[in-house]
UniProtKB/Swiss-Prot annotation:
Keyword presence, Ribonucleoprotein: no
Location of this chain's protein in the cell: Cytoplasm
Transmembrane segments annotated in the record for this chain: none
GO cellular component: cytoplasm
Stated regulation of activity: Feedback inhibited by histidine.
Keywords associated with the record: Amino-acid biosynthesis, ATP-binding, Cytoplasm, Glycosyltransferase, Histidine biosynthesis, Magnesium, Metal-binding, Nucleotide-binding, Transferase
Reaction(s) this enzyme catalyzes, per UniProt: 1-(5-phospho-beta-D-ribosyl)-ATP + diphosphate = 5-phospho-alpha-D-ribose 1-diphosphate + ATP
Organism for this UniProt entry: Desulfosudis oleivorans (strain DSM 6200 / JCM 39069 / Hxd3)
Highest taxon of source: Bacteria
Catalytic class of the enzyme: transferase
Lineage, top ranks: Bacteria, Pseudomonadati, Thermodesulfobacteriota, Desulfobacteria, Desulfobacterales
Protein name: ATP phosphoribosyltransferase
HAMAP family the record matches: HisG_Long
InterPro entries: ATP-PRT_HisG_long, ATP_PRibTrfase_cat, ATP_PRibTrfase_HisG, HisG_C, N-reg_PII-like_a/b, N-reg_PII/ATP_PRibTrfase_C
Gene3D superfamilies named among the record's database cross-references: 3.30.70.120, Periplasmic binding protein-like II (3.40.190.10)
Amino acid sequence: MTQVLKFGIPKGSLQDATIALFKRCGWKINVNGRSYFPDINDPDISCALLRAQEMARNVEHGTLDAGLTGKDWIAENNSDVHVVADLVYSKASARPARWVIAVAKDSPIQKLEDLEGKTVSTELVNYTKRFFQEKKISVNVEFSWGATEAKVVSGLADAIVEITETESTIRAHSLRIIHEMMQTHTQLIANHDAWKDPFKKAKLEQIALLLKGALLGEKLVGLKMNVPHAGLDAIVNLLPSLNAPTVAPLYQSDWFAVETVVDSETVRDLIPELMAKGAQGIIEYPLNKVI
């Protein structure tokens, strides 16, 4: 019997970013209308769309072999799963998000202990309850169905526990962060039995390798340039690289071709410096994956 890896794709805010990431790895996932079972161009994988909040529970219980979800939702469900890989990406950025405790700007609440006996609104109910229990602070934790930031403004809660990447929504609602509760990022997780299966483990290792390579590729760019012999040492010394830059002599010339990989955020400052040192014909190109 042909084996298939039952794989969960997070539905909602992470869905588009996940599908785009898989595409860069060579897997095309096609979501057909309202179907919860997308097509994928790999006969070894069967996909299912599932909310990130439910993913860990379904992987733990074996409904799915593996899936992608946030570290926060694994903690919320207290799920016993195998973490195959940490993958730092989200709908908005390539950095971890944070669950924070926030109150109104003009609130007298300044520290965690000031929340004793108060009402806290959040979607992350179970983790929040455990957090305050460990701190020995008695609070009333209420589940929020959405628009959590407005709960403080409307007087329905004294504080909220909410996820943020840029803090822009927090600031827009005139809220003030009093504590960072946890950092979270996407994780590739597997059911323990699936991880023991040689076929499924090998497939998951392949997925993890390529996803991590694609994420690293997003942060880096390649640079090629022609460099005169007289300026070669000075230019090579300017260049960061995964290892060392590749240097090759040009045919019947006193020039060299130099190629390297650099951080995409530093290249804007690096290119003028390279030109000042004599580099010519500089080409910057994107990297699909860096393994």
